[in-house]
């Protein structure tokens, strides 16, 4: 009997979170509404899988990249507090709204969140939230190897959570074997090897706004596609100049959020995008039998 491999449309959402002037800095509700609008738009255009950038809710901690002296520490601590207060828990009100949007659109959603730990007050994770097409929380992946400046905020993910390797799970779904990694995890050989051994077919590559998107970040995602013979939906943010708060912390790196989202086939070819210097949703029809 000849096996039929899934064919469907994927979407990479290239957008920026909603940022505020001090003292608020973040607006998780406005960013959540923006995400739900994008999910519904992608669903109307036929997408079955929608991928967002790293820590889209409530935004990437750009301010941690430029901390130079303890003279800035007071503002930094306030930023940390606002970041925590605007970060979702799983499950929670934010996951309910994303789930409702996913159900309405009839698609899977993979979105980066700054996850707040409901059990340990003040603990945060750089996480991927996986949502199913019926609005259900499939699970989360908490970043295992924190990238340099993110150590100011994020706790390492635990590979023993729930059951061994549940934190780096490959989901066996009707659209294929789905998983994802965050940013610098694409540099970790053993993490990629785990996905390969588990038979990953469709990969969500979540990246922040960094200038190296045009070189290292793109190449590392392509390398995974070739190694695993999988598709990848790479999502990176774009923050327009007019969207940058006028009264904000001086050590910001918003200028690095230039986009770079794309879709990559199992041979490492870029088949959609990359999109730079604009918000938008990239689409491509993938064929897991390729």
Kindly give the residue locations of the regions a language model identified.
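Conserved hydrophobic/aromatic positions in well-ordered beta-strands
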Residues: 11, 129-131, 262, 282
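Catalytic metal-binding/acid-base residues of hydrolase active sites
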Residues: 16, 56, 114-115, 187, ...
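A charged helix-plus-loop insertion that forms the helical arch/lid used to bind
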Residues: 63-87
């Amino acid at each position: 009997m000849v096996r039929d491999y899934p064919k469907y449309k994927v979407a990479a959402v290239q957008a920026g979170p909603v940022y505020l002037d001090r003292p608020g800095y973040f607006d998780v509700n406005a960013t959540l509404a923006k995400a739900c609008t994008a999910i519904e738009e992608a669903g109307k255009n036929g997408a079955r899988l929608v991928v967002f950038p790293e820590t889209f809710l409530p935004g990437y901690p750009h301010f941690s990249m430029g901390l130079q002296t303890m003279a800035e520490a007071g503002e930094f601590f306030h930023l940390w507090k606002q970041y925590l207060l605007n970060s979702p828990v799983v499950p929670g009100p934010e996951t309910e709204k994303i789930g409702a949007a996913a159900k309405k659109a009839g698609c899977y959603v993979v979105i980066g969140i700054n996850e707040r730990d409901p059990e340990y007050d003040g603990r945060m994770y750089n996480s991927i939230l996986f949502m199913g097409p019926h609005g259900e929380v499939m699970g989360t992946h908490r970043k295992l190897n924190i990238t340099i400046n993110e150590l100011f905020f994020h706790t390492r993910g635990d590979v023993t959570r729930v059951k061994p390797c549940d934190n780096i799970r490959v989901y066996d779904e009707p659209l294929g074997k789905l998983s994802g990694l965050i940013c610098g995890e694409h540099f970790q050989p053993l993490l990629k090897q785990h996905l390969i051994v588990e038979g990953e077919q469709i990969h969500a590559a979540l990246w922040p706004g960094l200038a190296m998107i045009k070189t290292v970040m793109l190449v590392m995602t392509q390398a995974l596609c070739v190694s695993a013979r999988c598709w990848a939906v790479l999502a990176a943010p774009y923050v327009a100049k007019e969207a940058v708060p006028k009264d904000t912390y001086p050590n910001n790196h918003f200028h690095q959020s230039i986009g770079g989202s794309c879709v990559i086939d199992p041979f490492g070819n870029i088949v959609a995008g990359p999109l730079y210097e604009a918000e938008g949703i990239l689409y491509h029809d993938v064929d897991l039998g390729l």
